[in-house]
Amino acid sequence: MNRREDMMEVDMIQIKDNQLDVQTYLSLREKVNWKKLSEEQARKALENSLITICAFQEEQPVGMARMVGDGAVICYVQDLIIIPEVQGQGIGSMLLEYMKRYAQSLIEPGTQMMLDLMCAKGRESFYEKHGFIARPTENLGPGMICYLKEKQEG
């Protein structure tokens, strides 16, 4: 898989890569009550992604996923959204497996890559079904986060 426009159709769901636009991204985020972004934040987020994919049902967007990272050592599933009306139908699994295949296509021979994510509380079992492990483990510490705000002058 290269960074290209691609399409896959499974069970009346079309998956298109690198065709997610700002308005669709913002709309899907809103439908799952995620934090509101400015259009500029959304545009930059999409432009700086390694890949974006969007799931369509009857030509309507019902889900999306977005990957960021360096494409060599670490890739990160940054967003995975499925609108509530179609959750539980396997669309999230389709998108996540697509992302895993994409990341695998980037691995240099003889090396490995970490595919990371932070899941919403209560969604751990979904990701564990797809081979992800919860941290901390015996060898890996906990994931951490720091929220940054605009620096105030003065």
Annotated model-derived regions:
Residues 86, 90-98:
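Conserved acetyl-CoA pyrophosphate-binding loop and the N-cap/start of the following alpha-helix
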Residues 54, 60-69, 73-76, 81:
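Conserved beta-strand in the GNAT
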Residues 17-18, 109-154:
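C-terminal "cap" of GNAT-fold acetyltransferases
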Residues 83, 87, 120:
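Residue-level recognition of the GNAT/N-acetyltransferase active site
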Residues 2-39:
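Short amphipathic alpha-helix that is part of the acyltransferase structural core
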Residues 44-54, 111-113:
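A short helix-loop-beta-strand connector motif used in the catalytic cores of GNAT acetyltransferases and
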